[in-house]
């Protein structure tokens, strides 16, 4: 008989598999992918109902941090999807409302179900091995792309040799690979260290270099630097040396945040970067709109980028400014509060379980860094959120009994 954990892993993997190809723009099955999301949510809800009847499902009597975060996400969606709708933007807002609604349903139900069944291991494992299957398949079926990889051109300001292994945009492949590497680190550090997972990490690294996605590569570097920064206490250093190293790491991260994804030299950054239009066009348009508190209206980055709205903005390639411009001061305040909630919870987790807390902070820092260059911030149209947001939500309330508890220990505590 298949266990509930097995059913969850299978359906969660199917959801991720469909999302990977849909968001990549290469989904070819005749079935409407939205039905897969609806079916997935329906299955988990039905299983939860059965568990409640059998008294196998934990019902919390008090509001958890995860519940508060979920309410903020839902509140943002409801406020700007149904209340503060800009009439000229209504058709675009409706599309966002549907996409974001399905996304939130899938992610929040996943997090709640996994947390209350103690399936954190299953979430990490299903994500890692689903991506592994996709990358392996795409690598084999597009093997000729390997010959076009040119590592030396990754930082070339004029041209880069880039391949996508059949997965849409190069940056999409880069994001998928960087996420796979981080998930692999979680698995190898806390669950197992088999050679197959190491092989998958190596494969993802090769494909990441092929994508030549600077955002993804620098995001991984930020992850590594943040993890090292908080791991310094494990090593014997004089305080002055430790302080110098920590200041250096902070400086490197700040420099990368400012210049990491630029397409040009540092000297010509503000003059030539495509993202300069955020400050020269998009923000002035926003401030002149008389909608600074509630924003210009929800619409995808592509709609704004092609100036299909009544407002001239060009591409809003920054998750924070995108949130400000589309949902105003109220919207950005909600998301900033959500970010602070995550950071405070992970800091508390670090004090209780150093290894888990450090990985949580490092992974979330990479996520925040990536939002500097793309509209990834809690965006249902971005695969990164399907892969990491359930993990982020579960970790909000994760508390270990001892410092040495690992993901393997979590797997032992089953109902």
Please place each PLM-identified region on the residue numbering.
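Transmembrane alpha-helices of multi-pass inner-membrane enzymes
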Residues: 182, 361-370, 376-415
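N-terminal signal-anchor transmembrane segment
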Residues: 1-55, 76-84, 367-371
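Alpha-helical transmembrane segments of multi-pass inner-membrane proteins
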Residues: 122-149, 166-230
């Amino acid at each position: 008989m298949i266990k509930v954990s097995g059913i969850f892993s299978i359906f969660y993997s199917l959801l991720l598999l469909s999302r990977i190809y849909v968001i990549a723009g290469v989904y070819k099955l005749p079935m409407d992918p939205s039905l897969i999301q609806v079916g997935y949510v329906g299955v988990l809800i039905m299983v939860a109902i059965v568990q409640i009847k059998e008294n196998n499902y934990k019902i919390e009597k008090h509001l958890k941090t995860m519940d508060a975060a979920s309410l903020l996400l839902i509140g943002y969606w409801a406020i700007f999807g149904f209340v503060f709708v800009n009439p000229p933007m209504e058709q675009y807002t409706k599309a966002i409302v549907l996409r974001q609604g399905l996304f939130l349903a899938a992610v929040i139900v996943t997090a709640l179900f996994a947390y209350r069944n103690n399936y954190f291991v299953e979430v990490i494992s299903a994500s890692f091995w689903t991506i592994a299957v996709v990358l392996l398949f795409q690598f084999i079926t597009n093997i000729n792309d390997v010959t076009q990889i040119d590592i030396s051109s990754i930082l070339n300001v004029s041209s880069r040799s880039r391949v996508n292994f059949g997965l849409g945009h190069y940056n999409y492949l880069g994001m998928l690979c960087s996420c796979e590497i981080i998930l692999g680190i979680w698995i190898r550090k806390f669950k197992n260290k088999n050679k197959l997972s190491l092989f998958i990490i190596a494969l993802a690294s090769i494909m990441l270099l092929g994508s030549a996605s600077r955002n993804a590569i620098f995001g991984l570097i930020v992850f590594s630097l943040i993890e090292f920064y908080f791991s310094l206490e494990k090593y014997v250093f004089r305080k002055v040396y430790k302080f110098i190293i920590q200041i250096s790491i902070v400086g490197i991260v700040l420099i990368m945040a400012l210049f990491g994804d630029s397409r040009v030299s540092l000297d010509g950054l503000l003059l030539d970067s495509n993202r300069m239009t955020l400050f020269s066009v998009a923000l002035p348009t926003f401030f002149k709109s008389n909608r600074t508190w509630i924003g210009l209206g929800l619409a995808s980055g592509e709609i704004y980028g092609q100036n299909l709205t009544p407002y001239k903005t060009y591409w809003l390639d920054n998750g924070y400014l995108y949130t400000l411009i589309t949902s105003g001061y109220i919207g950005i305040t909600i998301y900033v509060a959500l970010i602070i909630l995550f950071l405070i919870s992970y800091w508390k987790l670090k004090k209780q379980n150093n290894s888990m807390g450090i990985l949580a902070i490092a992974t979330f820092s990479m996520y925040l860094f990536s939002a500097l260059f793309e509209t990834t911030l809690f965006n249902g149209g971005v695969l990164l959120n399907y892969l990491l947001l359930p993990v982020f939500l579960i970790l909000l309330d994760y508390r270990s009994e001892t410092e040495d508890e690992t993901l393997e220990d979590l797997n032992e505590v089953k109902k």
